[in-house]
Amino acid sequence: KILFGIQPIIGRTEADAKKKQQQHNDLVTVEGGKAILSAHLDFDLSQFPDDTIMLERNEPQLQRMRTRYVDFDGRPMTLAEVARRHGQSVGLAQMVGTPKSVADQMEEFMRVAGGDGFMLTAIHSPGAIEDFVDKVVPILRKRGLVREEYTGTTLRDHLTQFD
């Protein structure tokens, strides 16, 4: 099974959701992001200046996340940029918007990428997962993209039900 990690950020309006995203993302400092990224890479990034272009580094430990060193527009990113983005969402897609637009984004992602589902990370707790369950899941259910009930008793049962 292929499950994609996402970070849904849900608001009453698109502007409200963007504001929540900005507030969340602003909490992450370069130093904090570097610490998280260093731990995930098992490599101390504090030895490099913040303006280091990550694609130019050849250390073997840095190669496994190489695709994350390029911005959405194709521009190579600095260590500071990569660190902040990694600290904000650990490299997961932030799906931001109203419940309907988040459901639309999820549906489109699956249509394009394929896969079997999503794993969610919350930007805050309590509240973020509850918002998703109460506001997005009903939309996905109406579209036939989320089941109404589960017949198994274990995670394995749930994941292999449609094999």
Spans of model-derived segments:
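A structural motif corresponding to the C-terminal end of an alpha-helix
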Residues: 108-115
